[in-house]
Amino acid sequence: MENKFIIKDNESFFKCRKLDQYMSNHKGYIAGGCFKDIFSNKKFRDIDIFFETPEDFNQALDFYRKNEDYVFVYENDNAVCFSNKNTKKKIELVRSRFCGVEEMLKGFDFTIVKFAYYKAIDGDNTEWKYMYHPSFFEDLTNKKLVIDDTSSFPVNTFERTYKYRKYGFGMCRETKKKLIELLQGVNIDDLGKDLYFGFD
């Protein structure tokens, strides 16, 4: 199924404006699970910030290392994490993959995490926008785990279904079928890599 994402300006979702403070002073974009929590009226614990290039990542890393409002938490091959001293929110600067917003969302497994807040830059003009999957709100409301395209890391996706079950989410029939087919093609030698490099 082809992904045709919806794009809205940053005035469309007032409850997401709390993320504005985490969008400044870097070229990254926020995507993934925090939007699931925001639109479910729950407190989000962490924010994943992605980047188009390694240079953009390094610029953001330098900013947060020097920012007295943040404290370093941990670092691994996938990301570097900082915590805001005032809000206690954790931000993860993701470096496991560099690409644009739409390409990144296509790489996410479930429709309920295919949501991003980004800066659309056209010359000297910068607009803050949202991009999300057409069935994001429907699947979130119905607590459905839907793989609309494919999963690059099916074992990781399978593991994540257990996490979501604790919050009342369940896979639709088509997703179960698709995930079973994907798992059959997994090389046993790649299990560790699949779990480690999967996207949130």
Task: List where the protein language model places each region.
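Catalytic cores of the polymerase beta-like nucleotidyltransferase superfamily
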Residues: 1-200
